[in-house]
Amino acid sequence: GGVHITGHVDHWTGHALHQVTFSKVRAKQKLIQWVDQLLVAAATGQRAGDAVLIGRDGDASVLPGIDPAVAVERLSELVELARIARRWPLPFYADDSVLDPIVKQEVQFDERDSVSQYVQKVRRSFVPTAWHPYAVGDEPNTQAAFAGRSLFDIRCSELDEFDAFGDQRLFAHLAELICGPVSDVLSGQS
């Protein structure tokens, strides 16, 4: 409640979202495509046509139209996360190394071992290594926001808004909240 959507959605034709990119279609682009599809459905109050993103070599991402009520619900969830993030830095970043395993449905959030493997894999993209000297964890803003703590070790119970999820890793919980729905759409489940 109380949120007004303003501006425009790039690549909106009035009936569907159509976009071409000179790069390969990446997971981050699919997430943006999904959010654009949510915005269009919520703003128009109608199920828009498919959102189509075509990349180099003909790889493509096609998202079916989204029901406006579902779009409003999903956007409300994202807005609530943004409000929480204003009070407390949330340990999540939309990098392809974070999103790829989710979009490819390699993570089963209801299986503890699968989540642990996912967190370990993503952790490696966050910290510097000999072959990858620059990492998100080195950025001054990241260092300041988390006061030297590993964002992968923060638990849901440390924030009132997520306390109901207990000892679950907050990073994994946020990944599921933010990316789980787009993964469902890409797999045809939603």
Question: What name fits each language-model region?
Answer:
Residues G1-S190:
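Structural signature of nuclease core domains in nucleic-acid processing machines
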